[in-house]
Amino acid sequence: MQGLYMEQLALVLQGLAGIVVLAPLFLLVLLCMTSLIEWKLGEKTTAWACLIAIIFGLGAAWGIVLIMLGLDQRQLVLIVGDWVAMGSYHFTIQLVFDLLSVPMVILTFLLCGIIVAFTNRYLHRESGYHRFFVFFALFLAGMVVAALAGTIEMLLVGWEMVGLSSVMLVAFFQERPQPIRNALRLWVVYRVADAALLLAVVVMHHQGETGTGHLLWGESSWPQKPAVLLPFWSWWVGLLLVIAAAGKSALLPFSGWLPRAMEGPTPSSAIFYGALSVHLGVFLLLRLGHLWESIPSLAYLLAVLGLGTALFAYLAGSVQTDIKSVLAFASLIQVGLIVAEIGVGWRYIPLAHLVGNACLRTFQFIRAPSLLHDRRRMESALGGHLPRPSEPFPLARAELRLW
């Protein structure tokens, strides 16, 4: 009876895992196909399709959480199949549900659901309404694949999907030249990060015959995962992955693209550069926490890089005149601090910091278009103009810019 019960439970887990991954992929296929055959869905239909996919994915993710709690397991690894199987070489498609991937997936579905509800009104009757949701579905699918990736090859697939959707939404307003130029600049930076990640994959493929999940992800649950690569190769692979994360998360010296990415619509700025996409590099660093523990020089580099990025973002944000740029640099300050926390050896604190920062920035970005309206309403209630912040309170002003 016990064996039959476990078999049935395994089937349930496989079904739930399939829903988590396939729901956003099905949404992407649906929106792409309707665009290709020039059969555009109505605005309400498009929004409801996105919400239904998100609800199914979120419900399945919570179902997996309940099963993990019931079994008292910290990690569930589901092997879907093989990418390549040639002789002794086989690279598997794995989905990993653990203390890092599950919070990231749930956060992704929750924030994306909020953005769908906001965008349905924000882009009402915009000519690019349907195009926005096509790239949004691509982003959602990429984030889910990257978060659940059991090997770095799978993470690379999700990584590329997120990068492509980011660039396309920066260039959303195609009638103006500046968004196109900024999107090309972002594309160049992302190509550098992608090249570093791809080189790391190539190096690791020379170290084993079973894909890179065994070499980097390890067999035990996060964050207790041993480093498997040889010390020499670990250092070079780690450096390449730091470069990849720096490009994706706008760390120094790649921070210049972040304010330029604000050319996109506010919903994409919120979910990409305030909440999720900008934290994808941080997620990669968190996933490989054991690697930094085994290489103190790279851990020190992460701490210095994170603090340097936070300082730069604070100074740059203090002179911005656009609210979206101010929020982008405020988010970058927190990203830098999270990277520094990873560098000093913390694991759960950076994860909680990531979740909190993503939620806060999403709220701030979607409130940004109403800022002037809120100020005028407050002035009307007070019967006059609001006073400007006075100089005797520099600490308070610094805290406002920081958070």
Q: Would you name each region that the model predicts?
A:
Residues Q2-W403:
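...captures the hydrophobic TM-helix bundle architecture rather than a specific catalytic motif
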